[in-house]
Amino acid sequence: VFQVEQPFRNGLMQSASANPLFQKFMGVKYVIGRSEDGENFTTEVQEAVAPVIYGTNRVIAEKTYQAMKFPYNQTMLMQYAVTGNEKIADTGVEMTKGIQETNVTFTAKQGVTKEDDSWKIKIKKEQKATLSLDEDTSGKERILYLQFDVENGHPNRDVSIVINGIRNKLTAKSHLYYNDNTTFTYVMKLSADQEKIKVTFGAGTYRICNLKSYVSDTTVLEDASLYRSTFTPDRNATKGNQISGSIKMKQDGYLITSIPYDSHLEIKVDGREVVTEKVNTAFVGCRMVSGEHWVTITYHAPGLSAGKWIS
């Protein structure tokens, strides 16, 4: 869904993403990194991140969401929750404002050549380069959205490109766990007045094409209007395979979680089991009516009862 970076050769592995929108979406409040000199640790606090469980009436149909192009397929998840309810009308849905196309240029000492709308890289060893933005910095922090396709001239070799410390890798087709990562996506925060970004091209012969680049301000990271109703967990009732707590729905809408969807998850609202749905394309949720409610989410492990009986 998010098309986050894929730094590993193994297509079954996924690292912690540096994408600030994905971090907000998954509720990552504290980000620990290193200073530019590599000597010290830094800590960034992101206040407006998604709660693990919340209520909202700001929803869009999955068919509407799936039709969105990059970068709106990322930014719209900061504004709306996605549901499988196809009866939801598109009326009133506002696309993320303030996103503008921008031109970018790769500069390197050797081995990097611009050809029409693409860039050809032919280098025998790792090459440092610079990515320059053609836009007014305005002295404020911004978000850069960058995406392009990679055509590998030597399919039996890996291709790796690091931009602003974010690595994407396309593995050799002969690799047992070929990752099929032919589209590299990078989303990053830029500091005020930052116009140049460090790039490292891995050795090989390959082409960058279909490049898309956009910038926006950081408003989308600061907006918490999606999380309209707060879920308050009960520490005594939440244990083992069960999460329980209260929520006051301000309007009819949906209960949204970042708990991966599984058919063995059960949701009860005020003691009554409700129909679970897949929300945000991958997580469990359900419909909710306005008012104060007690919610219990329980996971029933398949085969657990039989296993206990046998043992």
Regions found by a protein language model. Give the residues of each.
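Mixed-charge, polar/low-complexity N-terminal
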Residues: 7, 11-13, 31, 248, ...
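Accessory terminal regions of nucleic-acid processing enzymes
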Residues: 21, 35, 238-239
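Catalytic cores of secreted or luminal carbohydrate-active enzymes
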Residues: 24-30, 35-111, 207-223
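Active-site-proximal structural scaffolding
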Residues: 12-16, 24-25, 30-33, 177-179, ...
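Long, contiguous hydrophobic alpha-helical segments, chiefly transmembrane helices and signal peptides
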Residues: 1, 22-31, 257-261, 283
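Short, glycine-/Ser/Thr-/acidic-enriched flexible segments
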Residues: 6-8, 36-38, 48, 262, ...
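Extracytoplasmic/lumenal acceptor-recognition loop(s) of multi-pass membrane glycoenzymes
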Residues: 1-22, 49, 54-83, 166-167, ...
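Active-site-proximal, structured, solvent-exposed surfaces of multi-pass membrane proteins
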Residues: 99-311
